[in-house]
């Protein structure tokens, strides 16, 4: 049944977190930690029920709540969670995020869907321990042809868990064909970044393609497999993609060849490559990897971002658009605005905020879990007077 076998007492005052549906409890928030590891019931100082979750003192987050009503963490529970996630993604096409961790009530689990293949990541000890319960439930609800695991992320290493990479169910091609709005990307799953494709930028890519005009010049920095660059080329614009990942640039090259499109490619680190380029470009896109994983890293990373944005603005055409994204929770929208102001001041450029976007609906943002909002994009336009 996997009903609660442990009882965890929460410190007075800290029970408000669970009552407000925040799922994580840290060591200093637990008054009476249970002996052992396993499914646990969290109660307040007076013994009133708060949540059911998984307790493991070796985890950086010892208790993660799975449900806020009494009950087991059995196959039926996980079937219900997966069925709800599937229902909420109806109409989003064949490529989307099916499970987005805590925001879908499944802490430590990410599942991306690419047609009939699922690619998953297990990021927490609790979800790893419950694998034999939730994996059959996932297969029953979604009925994929194959499931591939890419549990080789930093969050897993922080949990002290070994990496797991490979096929866990059915048949999965070595090279997965990922489709998005008529573009197809041949992704080698064993070599790809994360789960293979950055689905969270889908709506930004659509917005970008709608804004690009034939004959414009586009610079796609941190391009990965060229989701933006290929859309620019499809609209008749000149596109230059920059990335340090040779495998990703190879995928971009193959995708462009198949479509009969031209995208120029530069292999290298972003900042030195930008310094060696000449403009102008009508669109410059900066989508760096997670730059800030801990709050203490924020000042140094903001300085680095100012350098990047300054070079991007140097290359930006008059009335051109700068797209600045951050997938770091600790780098807030206010930080991005500050970075842009500092870089613009250095060059004497006047900018206006054309648009601010966030992650799409298949990467849900829970009001009660601030960390579930991670992707922010500033679309800035050069605004001379």
Swiss-Prot record:
GO terms for biological process: methylation. Keywords: Cytoplasm, Methyltransferase, S-adenosyl-L-methionine, Transferase. The active site is at 327 (nucleophile). CDD domains: AdoMet_MTases (cd02440), PUA_RlmI (cd21153), RlmI_M_like (cd11572). It holds the Pfam family PUA_3. It comes from Thermus thermophilus (strain ATCC 27634 / DSM 579 / HB8). Belongs to the methyltransferase superfamily. RlmI family. Disruption phenotype: Lack of methylation of cytosine at position 1942 (m5C1942) of 23S rRNA. It comes from the Bacteria. Transmembrane segments: none annotated. GO terms for cellular component: cytoplasm. Monomer (in vitro). This is Ribosomal RNA large subunit methyltransferase I.
């Amino acid at each position: 049944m996997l009903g609660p076998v442990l009882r965890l007492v929460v410190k007075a005052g800290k029970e408000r977190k669970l009552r407000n549906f925040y799922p994580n409890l840290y060591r200093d928030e637990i008054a009476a930690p249970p002996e052992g590891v396993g499914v646990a019931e969290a109660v307040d100082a007076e013994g009133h029920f708060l949540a059911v979750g998984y307790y493991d003192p070796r985890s950086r987050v010892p208790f993660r709540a799975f449900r806020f009503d009494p009950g087991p963490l059995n196959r039926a529970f996980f079937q219900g969670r997966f069925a709800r996630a599937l229902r909420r993604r109806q109409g989003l096409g064949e490529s989307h995020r099916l499970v987005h961790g805590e925001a879908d009530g499944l802490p430590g689990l990410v599942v991306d869907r690419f047609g009939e293949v699922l690619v998953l990541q297990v990021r927490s000890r609790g979800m790893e321990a419950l694998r034999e319960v939730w994996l059959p439930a996932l297969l029953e609800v979604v009925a994929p042809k194959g499931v591939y695991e890419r549990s080789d992320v930093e969050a897993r290493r922080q949990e002290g868990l070994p990496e797991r990479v490979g096929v866990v169910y059915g048949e999965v091609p070595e090279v997965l064909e990922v489709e998005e709005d008529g573009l197809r990307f041949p992704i080698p799953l064993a070599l790809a970044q994360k789960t293979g494709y950055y689905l969270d930028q889908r709506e930004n890519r659509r917005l970008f393609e709608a804004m690009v005009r034939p004959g414009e010049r586009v610079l796609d920095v941190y391009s990965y497999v060229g989701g933006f660059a290929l859309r620019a080329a499809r609209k008749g614009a000149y596109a230059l993609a920059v990335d340090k990942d040779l495998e990703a640039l190879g995928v971009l090259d193959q995708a462009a060849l198949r479509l009969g499109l031209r995208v120029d490619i530069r292999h290298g680190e972003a900042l030195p490559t930008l310094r060696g380029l000449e403009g102008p470009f009508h669109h410059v896109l900066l989508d760096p990897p997670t730059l800030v994983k801990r709050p203490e890293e924020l000042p140094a990373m903001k300085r680095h971002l100012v350098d990047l944005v300054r070079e991007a603005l140097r290359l930006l055409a008059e009335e051109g658009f700068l797209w600045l994204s951050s997938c770091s929770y600790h780098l807030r929208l206010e930080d991005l605005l500050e970075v842009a102001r500092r870089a613009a001041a250095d060059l004497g450029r006047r900018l206006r905020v054309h648009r601010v976007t966030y992650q799409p609906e298949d990467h849900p943002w829970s009001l009660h879990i601030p960390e579930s909002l991670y992707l922010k994009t500033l679309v800035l336009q050069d605004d001379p007077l």
